[in-house]
């Protein structure tokens, strides 16, 4: 892959803890290349896992690839914004109108999106919640989701595709501390929301065919082994990752029936 560094970022809202930079490849595509900071170096492969889940469940998502660049493991994704688009995050959207006392943060946000003509907002947010449940994503802060706006007309065009799901699958835990049966994530201002409460927010389970994920735990283990030389991840952790993902898929499938 031949790439050159991009001087100007396509969007200044991109931030976070991971080392990252925009580049242009030989096909003139703007690519975001991200590194890792967790000891497990697992965030990058988690992005691949998120891509596989969202693809199989037909969710709008930003696809990620795992690559070796300059001798290091990185994740690569193409810029999902066009030249006349920008992303407005939930962090900036939430305060556009005053929240009613009897309305949850989640419903308040959906009301704002519906008022701007995004009729499919609930389904898109439910997709994100399903993904975060399956992967135990603990870092869905309010700058990690939003909408896409036209910079010329200021029209809200659509809900942004799912992106940035690396902080998941117990990547910050020692192998002996990993727990795939219970955990907590972030949803708006609740930074310790139990994943077990996410299912109650899903209105239409018929949209999800979890049978399409049946062989994914084995595929996830395979790619963890493929890059084992770079992550130094022990076999015991890889096996626990696959078993944990398998349990969470089965748990959600059982709940949805």
Spans of features found by a protein language model:
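ATP-dependent phospho-/nucleotidyl transfer catalytic cores
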Residues: 79-129, 251-252
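Conserved ATP-binding subdomain of kinase catalytic cores across diverse folds
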Residues: 1-96
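Hydrophobic faces of stable alpha-helices that mediate helix-helix packing
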Residues: 20, 103-106, 217
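C-terminal catalytic region of ATP-dependent kinase domains
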Residues: 36, 55, 152-257
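Ferredoxin-like alpha/beta domains used as RNA- or RNAP-binding modules
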Residues: 11, 19, 72, 128, ...
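Conserved kinase catalytic-core segment
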Residues: 105-174
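A broad, structural surface signal
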Residues: 48-56, 123, 127-131, 243, ...
């Amino acid at each position: 892959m031949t790439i050159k560094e991009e001087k100007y970022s396509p969007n200044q809202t991109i931030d976070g803890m991971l080392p990252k930079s925009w580049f242009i490849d030989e096909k003139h595509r703007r690519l975001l290349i991200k590194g890792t900071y967790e000891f497990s170096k697992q965030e990058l492969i988690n992005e691949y896992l998120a891509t596989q889940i969202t693809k199989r469940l037909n969710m709008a998502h930003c696809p990620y690839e795992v690559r070796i660049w300059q001798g290091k493991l990185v994740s690569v994704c193409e810029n999902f914004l066009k030249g006349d688009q920008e992303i407005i995050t939930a962090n900036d959207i939430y305060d556009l109108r005053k929240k009613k006392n009897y309305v949850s943060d989640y419903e308040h946000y959906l009301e704002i999106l519906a008022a701007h003509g995004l009729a499919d907002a609930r389904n898109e947010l439910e997709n994100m919640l399903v993904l975060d449940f399956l992967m135990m994503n603990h870092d869905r802060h309010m700058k990690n989701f939003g909408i896409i706006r036209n910079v010329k007309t200021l029209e809200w065009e659509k809900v942004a595709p799912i992106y940035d799901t690396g902080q998941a699958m117990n990547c910050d835990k020692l192998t002996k501390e990993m727990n795939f049966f219970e955990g907590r994530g972030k949803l708006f201002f609740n930074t310790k929301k139990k994943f077990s409460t996410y299912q109650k927010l899903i209105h239409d389970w018929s949209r999800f065919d979890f049978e399409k994920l049946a062989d994914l735990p084995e595929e996830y283990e395979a790619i963890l082994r493929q890059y084992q030389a770079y992550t130094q991840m022990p076999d015991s952790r890889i096996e626990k990752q696959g078993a944990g993902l398998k349990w969470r898929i089965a748990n959600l499938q059982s709940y949805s029936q």
